[in-house]
Structure formats: C-alpha cells, structure tokens
C-alpha cells in the first residue's frame, strides 16, 4: 500500500501548509501514540532542531501524545542522532524528531525512531497512517499522558560521542573550525571536540529560529572553507541543521564529502584489524568510492538513496559501514543511525592514529568528476518516461561508452528530478548533465502544458 504522508525521511513540508500544521500534528501525535506506545511503557521522547516553528509543532505533538495516554519527555534542541541514542538508553517507546534536516526554516517535518533507536519500518508508518484516518478520541481522563523535560540530555549525548573516540588518542594540537549550521549541534558539537583536546573555532553557532542552514552548514561550505584558510586550521567540520550529516574541509580549504569520508573511515577500520561485511553506498555514490573500496579488498554495494535504505542493506548483507555522498554516514557498531559528530570523530581518529592530514587521507580515493543538476518538476509528472528524456539518456550513455554513469532520480524531499552524470572528463560530464536537464525541462513543459 502506498503511503500518503511518510516519505523517505518522515513527513516534511512547508510550515503552515498541510501536513505541517498544528491540527495535523495534534492528530499525528495521537495516532503515533496509539501505534508506538506499548503496554507498561507509554513514554516517548520529543526533540527538535532550532527552527522557530519547532515550538508550535512540539506543543501540538505533545498534546496529541497526551491525548493517546502517552507520557512525553521533551528534550529541546538536540541532534537527530542524539534523540535516537536517548530513545534507546532511556527505554522510551519511541523518539520523535521535529526537523526538516538541511532545508530552510520555512520547512519543517517529523521523523520517528522505534524503541531501539532505528527509523520506523514501512509497516509501522502505514499503521500510523491508518490511525490518522480515524477521528481523534482522547483517552479517559485518568489515563491521559503527562509531559516533563529532560534537562541533562546534552551532557548525556556529549559523553556518548566522546566514548566513540579511542581513549588512547587525543585531538590535542588540532585546530578545528566547526560549522553548526545554526542548528541542533550548536551546543554540543564544539564541546565534544574541545573536551577531546582540540582548539575549536565555532561557526554558525548562534541560532535565532530563522537562520538554520542559511548560507552555512554542510550544503553551504564556502564560509567554512574561508574560515579554515583564515585561521590556518587543520580541518573544518560542517553539519546540517539536525546533525545527521557531516562534510569536512581539509587544511587547503578543499571539501571532502560523504564519499571521501566513508573511504577514510573504511580504510582506518581495515588498519585496525578489518571490517566485517560489505561497505554500502547508494546509486549516487561516486564510482571512485566503489573502486577505492575494492582496492581495500572489500565488496561495495549500492542501495537506493536514503539512509534508511543504506541501513536496510547493511542489516540484510551483514555490513556495519555505509553512507551517502551527502554525508549521512552509518557505523552500526557505534550508532543506530547517521551521526555527524560520531562520523567526524572517526575521521579525526584516522588523522590522529596515522599522523596524516585530511588531504593526505582523502587523496587515497580517485574521484571521478560528477555533476548533479536539480530540475524543478511537478510531483506526479512522469518526465522520466517521456521520449525526449529517454532519448537524451540513451545518447549520453552511448557517448560515455561504459566510462561513466547516468542516473535520474526524483527527490524524496523536494519537487525536483536529480540528474547525475559522472565520467572521466569534467567538461564532457557537465555538458552531458546540462543536455539531459534541458531534455527534462522540455518534457516537463510538454506534459504540463494546458490541453
């Protein structure tokens, strides 16, 4: 059965427009409470990023859960992976994150974690949607839920992150610029790196409810690149608004994306005595990553885009390490979901253990030029099947002749079609991507023209 509200990463949209409205969130809290809360364990954790709309949505969800007879423990602004960790360690029935990740403040969303700190499976999301179709009926007065706050949540998570870094190593002597995207990591990430010995120069760590991801964070690294050069830093670290993504910048100011970081972590794991199972990327992962992992003697598998699909493939194939180019990195022996801080610490572990710069570590992977063009489209318009587009893709694949890849993929979070092309020649890749993007625009105009 097709889901009506849940996408690849929960429920997301523009604040004030369905489903990101207070009345829907009230109903969602009630529906989720009825599905997720177990007998004898009826508490959920609710955390959020720093968007101003988080207050409104938090209050609505809190009321909905209470109406279902579920107790609510409010965490305040916390990274998404922190909520997954705390859900598991505090033995809650579920964790709820109010965030739209890397999107601007005008957007917001909801994602859930099960009691073991993992994202919900399709069956559970469908069960919540089934409850949403029922009228909201509060529990009897004596069984209504209560709400309370957990004030020591940041400290608990900081200590968890520090424990993921080898005790015998230190970050002393490293100067790090840390871009918190004016998001949920602002009050925890600098503390983690500082307490492990690094000199920390914080960036975008002053959220006002409106500046989350605004020209900062993992999607906008130019400010971080400039700051690394200005401060003569050893590396820069950038998170997205909810802290489940990370990209890094080397001492020269060059970006190392999720593919490069995944390679560095895999190589360090092999140096530490091996890595169980395959490394899992996605269909968008650079071909250079696949080749680099192969040189380490490890199999490389590709999942659909979305960290939940990377997670599913890791579980199915017996792997522990995977990730996306965007910086969602998963290390199942340390976390149950993508964790930007923990992932960055593993890269810093490699730097400290090998006494090499980030640039030297990243140079071990030969990246192929890759271009991605996001073409705005209307949802539900089948542009990929239009002859103009299929012909353009066929022509591109013929020209690349097995030396590269072409991939068209609708975004799961935005109304765009992502056109990805990679190959050995930058100019050829750019021209090919623009040609296909032009074909997509032409097909979309044809399919949406008034009849």
From Swiss-Prot:
Catalysed reaction equations from the record: alpha-D-glucosamine 1-phosphate = D-glucosamine 6-phosphate
Cofactor binding, note field: Binds 1 Mg(2+) ion per subunit.
UniProt keywords, alphabetically: Isomerase, Magnesium, Metal-binding, Phosphoprotein
Modified sites of kind Phosphoserine: 101
Signal peptide: none
Cofactor: Mg(2+)
EC annotation from Swiss-Prot or TrEMBL: 5.4.2.10
MF terms (GO), sorted A to Z: magnesium ion binding; phosphoglucosamine mutase activity; phosphomannomutase activity
Any matching Pfam family: PGM_PMM_III
Domain of life: Bacteria
Listed GO biological process terms: carbohydrate metabolic process; peptidoglycan biosynthetic process; UDP-N-acetylglucosamine biosynthetic process
GO cellular component: cytosol
Top EC class of this enzyme: isomerase
Gene3D superfamilies according to UniProt: Alpha-D-Glucose-1,6-Bisphosphate, subunit A, domain 3 (3.40.120.10), Alpha-D-phosphohexomutase, C-terminal domain (3.30.310.50)
Binding positions (Mg(2+)): 101, 240, 242, 244
Post-translational modification, as annotated: Activated by phosphorylation.
Record's keyword annotation contains Isomerase: yes
Residues of the active site: 101 (phosphoserine intermediate)
Function of the protein: Catalyzes the conversion of glucosamine-6-phosphate to glucosamine-1-phosphate.
Protein family according to the UniProt entry: Belongs to the phosphohexose mutase family.
Protein name: Phosphoglucosamine mutase
């Amino acid at each position: 059965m097709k889901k009506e509200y849940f996408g690849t990463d929960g429920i997301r949209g523009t604040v004030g427009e369905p489903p990101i409205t207070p009345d829907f969130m009230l109903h969602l809290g009630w529906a989720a409470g009825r599905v997720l809360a177990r007998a004898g364990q009826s508490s959920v954790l609710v955390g959020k990023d720093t968007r101003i709309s988080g207050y409104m949505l938090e209050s609505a969800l809190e009321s909905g859960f209470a109406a279902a007879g579920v107790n609510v423990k409010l965490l305040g602004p916390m990274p998404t992976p922190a909520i997954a960790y705390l859900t598991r360690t505090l033995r809650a029935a579920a964790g709820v994150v109010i965030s739209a990740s890397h999107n601007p403040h005008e957007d917001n969303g909801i994602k859930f974690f099960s009691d073991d700190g993992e994202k919900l499976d399709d069956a559970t999301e469908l069960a919540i949607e089934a409850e949403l179709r029922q009228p909201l009926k509060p529990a009897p007065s004596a069984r209504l839920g209560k709400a309370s706050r957990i004030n020591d949540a940041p400290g608990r998570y900081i200590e968890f992150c520090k424990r993921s870094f080898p005790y015998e190593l230190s970050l002393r002597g490293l100067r790090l610029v840390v871009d918190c995207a004016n998001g949920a990591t602002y009050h925890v990430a600098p503390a983690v790196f500082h307490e492990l010995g690094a000199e920390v120069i914080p960036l975008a760590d002053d959220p006002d409810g409106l500046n989350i991801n605004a020209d900062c964070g993992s999607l906008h690294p130019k400010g971080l690149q400039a700051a690394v050069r200005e401060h003569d830093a050893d590396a820069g670290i950038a998170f997205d608004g909810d802290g489940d993504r990370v990209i890094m910048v080397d001492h020269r100011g060059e970006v190392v994306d999720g593919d490069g970081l995944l390679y560095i972590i895999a190589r360090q794991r092999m140096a530490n005595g091996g890595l169980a199972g395959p490394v899992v990327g996605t269909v968008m992962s650079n071909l250079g990553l696949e080749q680099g992992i192969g040189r380490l003697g490890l199999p490389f598998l590709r999942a659909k885009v979305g960290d939940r699909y990377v997670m599913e493939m890791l579980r199915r194939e017996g792997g522990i390490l995977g990730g996306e180019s965007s910086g969602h990195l998963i290390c199942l022996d340390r976390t149950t979901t993508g964790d930007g801080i923990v992932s960055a610490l593993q890269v810093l572990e490699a730097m400290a253990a090998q006494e090499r710069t980030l640039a030297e570590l990243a140079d071990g992977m030969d990246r192929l030029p890759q271009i991605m063009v996001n073409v705005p489209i209307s949802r539900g318009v089948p542009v990929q099947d239009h002859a103009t587009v299929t012909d353009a893709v066929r022509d591109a694949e013929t020209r690349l002749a097995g030396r590269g890849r072409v991939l068209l993929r609708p975004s799961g979070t935005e109304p765009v079609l992502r056109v990805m092309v990679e190959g050995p020649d930058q100019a050829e890749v750019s021209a090919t991507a623009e040609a296909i993007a032009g074909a997509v625009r032409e097909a979309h105009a044809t399919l949406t023209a008034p009849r």
